[in-house]
């Protein structure tokens, strides 16, 4: 997956250290609250966990989420900018949202937007904004004015008020 470049362990450790400072997250502690910098908004994504919660086409909702978030990432980055995609306790990557976004055999990015069992975090290269997926709280937190504005302009179905 050419656009997705695995981070070296040294680089990944450095990035996680920065992330833990920025979002005041202490993984492994009893209270693993994610506290991002202002401005931020927390979106409840529990409705995508079950078709009983109001979305009959869960795969369509998740596809819409990925498409909308990719557009927002593109609006918030320059053509030469990169982003970090982090999967808690797994490989992290850099990628450009302006290049092709190949998927794996399950039809997902190497680090999916929807937190389907692990913490998935996305950050602009300068950490000025990001998207934080928390599977245990069934939430996606978006921080940074630029990313929030981009998402507000074309929100995914999952983020719209019901």
UniProtKB/Swiss-Prot annotation:
Domain of life: Bacteria
Pfam families on file: DUF2716
InterPro entries cross-referenced by the UniProt entry: DUF2716 (IPR020323)
Protein name: Uncharacterized protein YxiI
Organism annotation: Bacillus subtilis (strain 168)
GN (gene name): yxiI
